[in-house]
Amino acid sequence: MGTGLSLSPSYRKATLFEDGAATVGHYTAVQNSKNAKDKNLKRHSIISVLPWKRIVAVSAKKKNSKKGQPNSSYQNNITHLNNENLKKSLSCANLSTFAQPPPAQPPAPPANQLSGSQTGVSSSVKKAPHPSVTSAGTPKRVIVQASTSELLRCLGEFLCRRCYRLKHLSPTDPVLWLRSVDRSLLLQGWQDQGFITPANVVFLYMLCRDVISSEVGSDHELQAVLLTCLYLSYSYVGNEISYPLKPFLVESCKEAFWDRCLSVINLMSSKMLQINADPHYFTQAFSDLKNESGQEDKKRLLLGLDR
């Protein structure tokens, strides 16, 4: 009906042990091959681990050497600085106790050279100019002293010489005009003290010197221009804030007075600021005003010699 085939498991085992020597040798060869593979694996792992340990050790030595170098250089720097400080302290101590020897004098020249050099020195001394006491940068100090009445007289003489067409003008006439205005303001209570002082007369002279023309044809015209300059002097260097116009007016038209004021301001504004800020400029104007009297004396002397 049907056939069946059955294979027993012991049949393969039987074949393995059919030849005893052959089977044992084969088994031994298989085991040896397995052991050789294991030994190779172990040997490779040991070989790979040894260089890694060496690399780690070498890197650690390098790090230690790098860390040690800054410390050694720092110690060297400290030692060098200590040595330098010690040398400086020793040098300072030596300088404090050091006595400088006197400089050696040059040898004396022969007699003939000495006489020639002495004559040359004497000639050079004669030719050399004497140095000035003051330095070149600083101007010389000038002292000028004068009273109020003296300066007013000098101002009157200046106006008489400037206005040569006014034959009957006296040096005292301008002085009377100025004192009349000053007295009027005192009596009216516009000022507590007189305005006519040496400094204010110098300021007025500075204005009159550039404003009053030599072509003035009448005493009235001269008085109008002079009182205009006096009003500006009051306004600029006076003690009060404002002053009335009536004492300064010699004419009924105020527009003419203000026109003269504006022309004087446009002409003399810079000098009015300069005389207040520069003391040397004020001293020069003071000296010029005082010298006006000397010019009058010279003129009188020349007129006497002509006669």
From Swiss-Prot:
Tissue occurrence: Brain and neuron specific.
Gene3D superfamilies xrefs: Cyclin-like
PANTHER family referenced in this protein's UniProt entry, alphabetically: CYCLIN DEPENDANT KINASE-5 ACTIVATOR, CYCLIN-DEPENDENT KINASE 5 ACTIVATOR 1
Pro residues composition bias: residue spans: 100-110
Subunit annotation: Heterodimer composed of a catalytic subunit CDK5 and a regulatory subunit CDK5R1 (p25) and macromolecular complex composed of at least CDK5, CDK5R1 (p35) and CDK5RAP1 or CDK5RAP2 or CDK5RAP3. Only the heterodimer shows kinase activity. Interacts with EPHA4 and NGEF; may mediate the activation of NGEF by EPHA4. Interacts with RASGRF2. The complex p35/CDK5 interacts with CLOCK.
Keywords: Biological rhythms, Cell membrane, Cell projection, Cytoplasm, Lipoprotein, Membrane, Nucleus, Phosphoprotein, Ubl conjugation
Site residues (Cleavage), renumbered to this chain: 98-99
Bias type Polar residues, positions: 112-125
Region spans: Disordered: 96-136
Post-translational modification: The p35 form is proteolytically cleaved by calpain, giving rise to the p25 form. P35 has a 5 to 10 fold shorter half-life compared to p25. The conversion results in deregulation of the CDK5 kinase: p25/CDK5 kinase displays an increased and altered tau phosphorylation in comparison to the p35/CDK5 kinase in vivo.
GO cellular component: growth cone; nucleus; perikaryon; perinuclear region of cytoplasm; plasma membrane; postsynaptic density; protein kinase 5 complex
A Gene Ontology BP annotation from the UniProt entry: rhythmic process
GO molecular-function term, one example from the UniProt record: protein kinase binding
Free-text function comment from the UniProt entry: p35 is a neuron specific activator of CDK5. The complex p35/CDK5 is required for neurite outgrowth and cortical lamination. Involved in dendritic spine morphogenesis by mediating the EFNA1-EPHA4 signaling. Activator of TPKII. The complex p35/CDK5 participates in the regulation of the circadian clock by modulating the function of CLOCK protein: phosphorylates CLOCK at 'Thr-451' and 'Thr-461' and regulates the transcriptional activity of the CLOCK-BMAL1 heterodimer in association with altered stability and subcellular distribution.
Homology family: Belongs to the cyclin-dependent kinase 5 activator family.
Nucleus listed as a keyword: yes
Modified residues (Phosphoserine): 8
Organism: Spermophilus citellus (European ground squirrel)
Phosphothreonine: modified positions: 138
Protein name stated in the entry: Cyclin-dependent kinase 5 activator 1
InterPro entries the UniProt entry points to: CDK5_activator, Cyclin-like_sf
